[in-house]
């Protein structure tokens, strides 16, 4: 940044469109510096302290990776303001408290990983939060709710698909027994009625087939 002072005493600021970098022992000049950052990756840098609330001012941020550091404290509530965010990784830190409910309102958030922290409470129930696999939330002894199996009411949450499958099987069994009972009842009644008619009355066609009763002469 370069600043100049004019004759009237006011100061004006200008920014260079390049920067000198030294990367792996090599000197290079990076031109066309971006003034709008869309991705930040601070992973694996042993950073300490709390994540500042000012992180929520980066509303154009698309990807944020703070994994494998030593961040502590709560997840900033201001992260709900990152309306363009698509990927959020805060795994393997020392974060505590609950997951902000506002994160479930981030429409573009397709990936989130907060595993291996010290988070607790119920996971916000929203498509963006519960869509990822349970591995994205594991390693937090106090977390509960979907997609984890631990219920917030002290019991394990049964797998949804398995539960539906078992219910369908039970319904099928009930329907099969109802069908058997429905067919069995009228069938027995009809059979008994025919037997009674034959026993009490012999129609002509039946007499012709089996013949009239004849007494044997002794």
Curated annotation (Swiss-Prot):
The chain crosses the membrane at residues 179-199. One of its GO terms (cellular component) is plasma membrane. Its main location: membrane. Residues 200-218 are cytoplasmic. LRR repeats lie at residues 34-58, 59-82, 83-106, 108-131. It is found in: Cell membrane. It is a single-pass type I membrane protein. The keyword Transmembrane applies. The keyword Cytoplasm does not apply. Glycans are attached at residues 65, 113. Residues 1-178 are extracellular. Pfam families: LRR_1 (PF00560). Keywords: Cell membrane, Glycoprotein, Leucine-rich repeat, Membrane, Receptor, Repeat, Transmembrane, Transmembrane helix. InterPro entries: Leu-rich_rpt (IPR001611), LRR_dom_sf (IPR032675). Belongs to the RLP family. This is Putative receptor like protein 25. The lineage of its organism: Eukaryota, Viridiplantae, Streptophyta, Embryophyta, Tracheophyta. The gene is RLP25.
